[in-house]
Amino acid sequence: MVATQIAYYDFTKEQLAERGGSATVRELLNDGTEFRELESKVNLAEEGLKRIMAAKDLELCESIAGSGSRYGDWKILDVKNTNEETGFYAVLLETDSGHAIIAFRGSESKDYNQVLKDWINADFGLLMARDTVQQKNAADYMAEINQKYSYPYYAVTGHSLGGNLAEHAAIAAPDDMRGRIYQAVSFDGPGYSGEYIERNKDLIARVAHPVVHYRWSLIGALLTQPTCAVSRVIQVTEDIRSNTDKEALYMRHGTPFIEWNGGESVVDGTEDLLAFAMGKWSLKVDETVMKKRREKE
């Protein structure tokens, strides 16, 4: 899960260039503005879930940057950022000499531009059975990494829309790379349209290792997961579990509200009624869209 959070930090190619082409996560966090921005969010957040979420984000950042953290030792080798144009952002992390992680950023709602790029063009694009620009970006980035690097083992991951992109990256990876993708994890990412599943069925069948899909909110219940994915409902923390107001239903999707067993493993949960209902609704919408498209052909 840590890699998905690192993908939300605003690291740049310029920062890497200043350090000879790569830098540890700890170096960039300590030299950048992430701490100040997260501290500001805590100070400005209203009491309640927003304050809790902001505090947990800051706590995780401090933990990653800590002197004894193995996550802080990870090297950032590359940043792919077309966030302003398409909403796409991903980082390549080296965890040791033989392993690398490609982490994809998820949906953001910090300003109108990001709402348009992520929630409308990308997330709603999935619901309406449209190919998304960000999915193409993810596939292109996998091809670029495959050309530039030769790690024996890769993992792909992301939260929310980033989880959908991570699954797509595993599905659309170059043939000589897919066998080296030993792990793919989607954290509450939405699924895919029926048209996507049909169009990519041969590639889906060739995914070398099962994709793990953790879900705990209505976002992760949307649309259809491919046959290469194993979906698992996990538990959220007590401070939001029984809260049914509108804000809680939206914020539940955040990774700070995942329940951890000893800080290492997730806990099995049960699907809430809203997620169940929205999942069924999204399938009906997808079926209607496919039917109307075929009528026009």
Per-region residue spans from a language model:
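N-terminal low-complexity, Ser/Thr- and acidic-residue-enriched intrinsically disordered segments
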Residues: 1-59
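Serine hydrolase/lipase
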Residues: 96-99, 143-154, 171-297
